[in-house]
Design a protein with these regions (language model features):
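Long, charged, low-complexity, helical-prone intrinsically disordered regions
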Residues: 1-405
Length: 405
């Protein structure tokens, strides 16, 4: 069995995610987005918008500044000239994925016939599910709240938390998980549901994929997107179960699609595409949002980069080590620091609440490169300034580097 060094594994992983290639010289187009999605497979969705919403960030991190309408049009609009490219589903967590790949998750839709959560609510309300579908047929694309109002259902006094949702909203979400409904569009990030057959092409809706074939394809795509990964890494990409991935990996290895290797310092074997080229140089510089596919499986981040990373949104402010919404900084293929970022629209600034260098890193080198990326990000977000707070061992040097730009 081939043995790779940790550095080789890291270079493979970074390159597989598209960071080793130069950014487009011209505008980022729909074709650029299509190629990126074919490579990384998913753009995770998240409601936090303290800097920029999560599904926009991985595109910026790999392709540079771009018009976010490119993603919006690909995901939430359709025309004969510009067909819908992306669709929402539980691919990793809630995520955008290629429309053509939606049938690969039919097995999951069957598992979620009564929803992903709150299944007892759906089971005891079969008529309500029929009523929701009828309401959507009558209303067209509608939010869960609009569906609820149309049905004359009792609405809760507060908005937001899952545990405060009405039965109608639970059932609507369950119908999404079951593939009966999907997202037609989003307005202010609110999901507008419609019947899946009204949103996706008839050929996609009609396509049936054998469960084993779908699982092999998802496993292969996960392994390819990761570049190199253990069974646990590969499982996490599409949130598959051990019993699904083990036979898929065995079949892919037997068919010569994947090669099993060892990596120095890793306790489990890893898999990579057969014939995978190992990059010789460390490349890739970018700010990474917490839900970037390169880093969304934290055990792999620790193994690849020796970088301990946890999101601290739900940690009480006084107990946070680094901050509320912290972006790791990738420099020449290594994670060398992190910044807690906030877009302050009223102040026209991308504000660095805290800045931290990793142990052993040359702070001046990190600060100079980071300042450049922050300036680029601020411009992309339509903000004229980068400001740096006092928190963190890198803050002083980063502030000086920003001022020099």
């Amino acid at each position: 069995m081939t043995t790779l060094t940790g550095a080789q594994a890291r270079r493979i992983a970074v390159a597989a995610q598209g960071f080793a290639e130069p950014r487009p010289r011209g505008s980022v187009t729909r074709a650029c987005l299509r190629r990126l999605i074919s490579r990384i497979q998913v753009l995770q969705l998240d409601s936090v918008s303290v800097a920029v919403r999560a599904h926009y960030a991985p595109v910026f991190s790999r392709l540079g500044p771009y018009d976010r309408d490119v993603v919006d049009r690909a995901a939430w609009s359709h025309s004969a000239r510009s067909p819908r490219l992306l669709v929402e589903y539980w691919a990793h967590e809630a995520a955008l994925m290629a429309v053509d790949d939606w049938p690969l998750l039919r097995w999951r839709m069957r598992e979620y016939t009564h929803g992903r959560w709150g299944t007892q609510i759906v089971r005891k309300n079969p008529r309500l599910a029929d009523d929701v579908v009828a309401a959507v047929k009558e209303l067209g694309p509608a939010t869960a709240g609009q569906i609820e109002a149309h049905l004359g259902a009792e609405q809760r006094g507060r908005k937001g938390p899952w545990w405060d949702r009405s039965d109608t909203k639970w059932v609507t979400e369950a119908l999404f998980a079951a593939g009966v409904l999907t997202t037609a569009t989003r307005v202010g990030f609110a999901r507008h549901y419609d019947l899946t057959e009204n949103v996706l092409p008839a050929a996609v809706v009609a396509r049936e994929v054998d469960d084993d074939e779908a699982l092999r394809e998802l496993t292969l795509r996960a392994a390819t997107a990761l570049g190199i990964g253990t069974e646990a890494d590969i499982r996490d990409y599409f949130r598959l179960a051990p019993g699904q991935v083990k036979p898929a990996l065995a079949k892919l290895e037997a068919d010569g699609e994947l090669e099993r290797v060892e990596v120095d310092g890793w306790s489990a074997p890893a898999y990579l595409r057969a014939g995978q080229i190992i990059p010789r140089r460390d490349r890739g510089t970018a700010l990474l949002c917490p839900f970037d596919p390169l880093i969304f499986f934290r055990p792999r981040v620790q193994r690849l980069f020796d970088f301990h990373y946890r999101i601290e949104i739900y940690v009480p402010a006084p107990k946070r080590q680094f901050g509320y919404y912290v972006w790791p900084f990738l420099l020449d293929g290594s994670l060398v620091g992190r910044v807690d970022l906030k877009a302050e629209r009223t102040g026209d600034a991308l504000h660095v609440v805290g800045a931290f260098a990793e142990p052993g890193q040359q702070s001046s080198r990190v600060a100079e490169a980071l300042a450049t990326e922050l300036r680029t990000m601020a411009s992309w977000l339509g903000l004229s300034m980068v400001t740096v707070g006092a928190k963190g061992d890198l803050a002083k040097e980063l502030r000086a580097a920003v001022k020099r730009r």
